[in-house]
Structures are given as C-alpha cells and as structure tokens.
C-alpha cells in the first residue's frame, strides 16, 4: 500500500492555471471513477476549491507521473505546464499534507475553517463514487480527528478570518462608510454566506443576493435582511451596486465587460469595487480595464490576508506539532494493520495443526493408550509441527548468510540472552 497526494494550490499556480484544473461538482464522480480505472489506483478522492485542486490516492505502487498525465489530459493541459505548478507528496508526507490542509495550515488564510468542510465533502463524494476503501477511509477519519484537535487545542481559529473576510476588509479600506454602500453578492454558497454575514455586521445599507435559483438566493437573503434576485437580474442591480463580490461554481463568466460598461454609464461613472473569489473566474478579466472599476481576484487578497496571519503564527507552531503527532500515529497504526493478515494466517495454520494432533490424540485414547502417553505424544507432535516450517526457513537463511534475518527471528521468538531461563 502507498499513499499519494498530488495537486496545485494558490502558492504554486496562478488563478489562470487553477481555474483550468478545477473540477465542477458535476464532474467529480465520473472523474474519480476514470482516475481509478486509468491510473491503476485502488482508492481515490479529489478536493477542488477556489485555491486548490488535489488528488488523494492509494496504490500498490506509486506512480505520480501516470496520475499527472491523467490530470493533464482530463483538463486538456500540456503535461509540462501542469508539472511546473504541481507538487507530489508520498506516504508519510502525503498523510501529513492532508492533515495540514484540513487544519487550515496550508490555506491562503491561515487557520480558515471552511477547508475542513470542503475536505469532508470530498470524502463524501468519493464514497458516492465508490472510490474510497478501508485505507483511504481510515486516512480521512484520522485527518478529520487531527483537524478537530488543532481547532480545539490551539488558538488557530480565534478571531476567524477567511477569503470572505479579506474581501470585506478590502472593501472597508476603499469605502470609508460602508453604511452608505450597496452590495451585490453573486452566488449563494458558503463563501458568499460568510461575505453576507460580514457585510451585514458592518451595517451595509443594502445587500442583494443573485443566484441561478431564486429559492437558494432567498434562503440566504432571509438570514441577513437582503434581497434575492436571479442571475438574469444582475445588469439592473449593477446600476445600484457599489460593491460586487462573486463566488459561484460556474464554468463560464457571469459578468462581462459590456454589462459593466452599461451600468457605469447609468451610474455616471461612480466607481464599483469588485472581488471575484471564484475559480474559474465569474467576472471577465477585461472588466478590470475599465477606469471606474476596481477588480480584485483571490490572488489579490494576499496582502490583506498577510495582516491577519500575524495573530495566528504562534498558534500555527503548536498546530504543526499536533499534525506531526497525528500523522506519525496514523502511520504507526497503519503499519500495525499490515501484520494483521499475517497473524491471522499464522493463527489459522496453527489451529489446523492443533486440530490434526488433537484428532490423533483422541484416536489413541479410543484405542486404549494411557493418558500420560497420549498427552506426551500430543505435546511432541504439536511442537514438531509448529517448529517445522520455521526450522526449514531458518536453516535456509543461515546457509544464505542472512544474519540479519536470523537476528530478526531471534527477536521475533523472544530468544534474547537468558530468555531460556525466564519463567513464562
């Protein structure tokens, strides 16, 4: 068995590359099944967010290159381009990486809690696809436990910040009085929910939530006294919007340069602040060329995020130690599991030999042999049979000069100095 964690993230790839390697929710089940089928992977899961796309795989023999080729072909990328941004972690390092990701230690915003929920969703989808078995399943459970301990035992989650928080913080820097501003939020997922909460707490004058389905938009809008509209209503809402923050799972841009130009004319070129958190992008990059638009992507939030990192650096060290302990403990338990099948087979063999000797003993008793003779024969027969295979193998190893194996056998059978004198 061997674990592999492979992917790209906000530190290794630009938003342009990340959006081309992203998986939509609709793609995941089919992609997972194809991944296992074409790369000889026994178990697999895919984590795809705005900041990372990662594959977690269990194989008999690690083949990162085969997986990279599959990922490049699936997304119609050149292998060289993908290799330039990709990272690969194997076995212990893969386990540690997964735990760091789930704990928020590898996030754009250190310690952000949303990633754990996204990791749990990745696990649920892989189970639905039938690509998670006992080994990867155990790794996910250990990962969730480690992340929970980090959240509970350290201050990594205090004064919570996120990409959503960073976007709102940037808006505060641009608009001195948010209570006079109107905001248009595109999408109705977890990130937009956080944005809505932050804006509501800051007393933004009016919030509008635009979504593909009005029902989903209404559910979110009701929580914060906002208004719900459809995506088709965005052009009209743009005219009144000072702040636009977008985060959907759309594969195509939702907001184009033409629509924004029209809105700016009706606004008499009053500036609009925009943050596109989505990957792939919701807002056409050309929108940023307009004079009265301030367009930011997730990659532009780094400076805002950097300010929030300072308060979490101390907690991060303690969190890293907990992750290291969790990863080491998991690998120890996993290696112990490797012995289970051997022990089971050895026990079954021993029980078969015992039953054979027991049947001989019962026949001897039935034929009138004395109990002491039968017990002695039973003990000798069982001892000889149990020692036969090990004796043959030890002689063979000795003839081959395998002193290391002989030393291991001495340890295995507890034959250290003076062991024969000890009472069991």
UniProtKB/Swiss-Prot annotation:
It catalyses: (S)-4-amino-5-oxopentanoate + tRNA(Glu) + NADP(+) = L-glutamyl-tRNA(Glu) + NADPH + H(+). It comes from the Bacteria. CDD domains: NAD_bind_Glutamyl_tRNA_reduct. Catalyzes the NADPH-dependent reduction of glutamyl-tRNA(Glu) to glutamate 1-semialdehyde (GSA). This is Glutamyl-tRNA reductase. The record marks 97 as: Important for activity. During catalysis, the active site Cys acts as a nucleophile attacking the alpha-carbonyl group of tRNA-bound glutamate with the formation of a thioester intermediate between enzyme and glutamate, and the concomitant release of tRNA(Glu). The thioester intermediate is finally reduced by direct hydride transfer from NADPH, to form the product GSA. Substrate binds at residues 49-52, 107, 112-114, 118.
